Structure formats: C-alpha cells, structure tokens
C-alpha cells in the first residue's frame, strides 16, 4: 500500500509505510474513516488530502481532519485522521433558501460546484419546492433528496465523483477465515407493527413470520415510516456474522459476501453492514460484519 499526502500548495508528499493503520466503512455512516500512524524524521507540513493506493488503484482519498505529531523514546510519529470525500458535504452548510422544482443539476450548481465537486452520476427531478433551513449541511440536503426520489444513499468515490443512485451490488468471495463470531439478538425482532389508519386508530396490523416473542410497535401516519421496513430492520439487526480474513478486502460498499466458516456453516448472499481493514506488524487483515443472507 502506498500513501500520498497533498500539501496546502497542492504539491505531493510520499508518506511511506505506516506503523499501523485502519480503514473503516459503515453503511450507516456517510464517510469512510482512515486512521494511520507514520514514522517521521521531522515535523511535516500541514496536509490537506491523503490518498492510499494499492497496485495503482486508489483505495481511499479523503480530507485530513487531524494531524498529530508526537515525540517519544522511539522517535517522531505523525498520526493522521481522515474522512473520505463525503466529509466535504458534511462540513459545509447549504445556503438557506427555496429551490423551485429542484433537480440534481440545480443542486449540483448550488451545493456541489462551489465545493469543487463537478462530476455527478444520476438524474432526478421533483415537482415540488425544496426549502433549505439555516444550519442544514449540504450532505443532509443531498442525501434526503436522493433517498426521497431515488431510494438510495449518495456517495463520493475515490476519483471525487458523486454517485446519487447508490452503490452497485458487488460479490465478495471470502476465502480463509482467521476468526469469526456469530451473534444472534432475538430481542431486536419486532413481532408486530400496528399502523395508524385515516380514522385515527391503530388498527392495521403487520406481522413478522420470524418473531417467537411478542414485541409490538405502533406507527403513526405522521412518521411516514413503512411498518414493513420496521419489521425488516429488526430482522436484520437480530443477526450478525463477524469474520476476519487475511489481506485487504476493499471496497466493501454494496458488497454481498459468500463465506464458509469451519464449525459455523456456510453463509451466502450476506450484505456487508460494516468493515475495518487493518495494517500493523502482523500484516494486513480485514474484519467484516455481515447481515443475514439467503
């Protein structure tokens, strides 16, 4: 793995091999996180961006949130904490106002181009007006728009391109498993959601076929939440399989994994919930948390 840093003047700096590093993905978090500690012979100039490449392919590109230099008995080290390209949208507020008949093209000119994001993949248009309240981040505006019209979470790839139609599904075939944990949490299962009707009563039941214990919820009309999704979310959260495999398995976004764990069984089509790639004196390995599959 090769790590490069970009200085404030735009010049590049080869950072060398880290003593330790971790790259974290979580489906529920907008940005990936890179944390790395590098040996150094001096205090580095302030870095703006960090890029990690593997065999010519960019694995991570993100903003530097923290740059901490430490002196110990073993010498100087520089710790970097970085977030991927979504951080730019998270850290910037959108200009308050109203956009009539918003489209991705309009949002691109209003929110993205001032931040240097000029390439957008996806199309969407709404017949209503979009009201942006003061203090709302660019990410919140864009994410809500994409989820409402496209049913997908946007993301920024390692080339700085914003994808608004979600990540394509990709197959992960996991080979050797160093360790694994199978966790069942039946307390997360929801047995029934009673949805409020137009008459005001909670008289429309949605039942789970899997729950063995009664755990009931009530859904109001104002919430707008699909009761079937409430049940499905509980089902997803009731199961997790955490595996650790040798090497770097990345990217994980949109991944579905097939894995056979000695003693635990074979698992197919398991969506990736989160993951963490690690580099240290023991080499490279990847920890992946999987949801219930087929």
Predicted regions and their residues:
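Charged- and aromatic-enriched interaction segments used to assemble
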Residues: 76-77, 81-187
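Oligomerization/assembly interface segments of phage tail-like spikes and tubes
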Residues: 22-40, 75-87, 237-245, 272-273, ...
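Glycine-centered tight beta-turn/hairpin loop motif at sheet-sheet or coil-to-beta transitions
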Residues: 10, 55-57, 264-265
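Surface-exposed cap/loop segments at beta↔alpha junctions
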Residues: 38-118, 285, 292-294
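Solvent-exposed edge beta-strands and adjacent loop segments
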Residues: 1-28
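A broad structural signal for short, well-ordered beta-strand segments within beta-sheet-rich domains
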Residues: 14-20, 64, 125-129, 177-183, ...
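Acidic, small/polar-enriched beta strand-loop surface segments
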Residues: 2-3, 143, 147, 152-294
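Short amphipathic beta-strand and strand-loop transition segments with alternating hydrophobic
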Residues: 20-26, 65-71, 275-278
């Amino acid at each position: 793995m090769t790590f490069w840093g970009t200085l404030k003047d735009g010049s590049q700096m080869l950072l060398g091999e880290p003593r330790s590093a971790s790259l974290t993905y979580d489906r529920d978090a907008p940005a990936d996180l890179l944390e790395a500690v590098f040996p150094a012979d001096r205090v580095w100039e302030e870095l703006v961006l960090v890029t990690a490449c593997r065999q010519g392919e960019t694995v991570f590109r993100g903003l530097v949130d923290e740059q901490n230099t430490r002196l110990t008995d073993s010498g100087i080290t520089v710790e970097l904490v970085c977030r991927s390209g979504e951080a730019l949208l998270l850290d910037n507020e959108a200009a308050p106002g109203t956009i009539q008949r918003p489209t991705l093209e309009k949002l691109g000119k209003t929110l993205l181009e001032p931040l240097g994001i000029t390439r957008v993949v996806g199309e969407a248009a709404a017949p209503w007006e979009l009201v942006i309240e003061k203090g709302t981040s660019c990410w919140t505006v864009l994410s809500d728009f994409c989820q409402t019209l496209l049913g997908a979470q946007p993301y920024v790839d390692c080339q700085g391109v914003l994808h608004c139609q979600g990540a394509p599904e990709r197959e992960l075939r996991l080979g050797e498993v160093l360790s694994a944990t199978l966790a069942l949490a039946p307390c997360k299962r929801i047995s029934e959601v009673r949805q409020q009707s137009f008459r005001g009563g909670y008289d429309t039941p949605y039942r789970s076929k899997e729950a063995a214990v009664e755990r009931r919820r009530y859904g109001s009309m104002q919430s707008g939440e699909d009761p079937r999704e409430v049940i499905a979310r509980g089902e997803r959260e009731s199961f997790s399989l955490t595996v650790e495999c040798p090497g770097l398995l990345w990217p994980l976004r949109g991944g579905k994994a097939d894995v056979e764990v000695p003693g635990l069984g074979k698992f197919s089509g398991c969506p990736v919930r989160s993951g963490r790639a690690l580099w240290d004196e023991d080499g490279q390995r990847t920890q992946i948390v999987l949801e219930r599959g087929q």
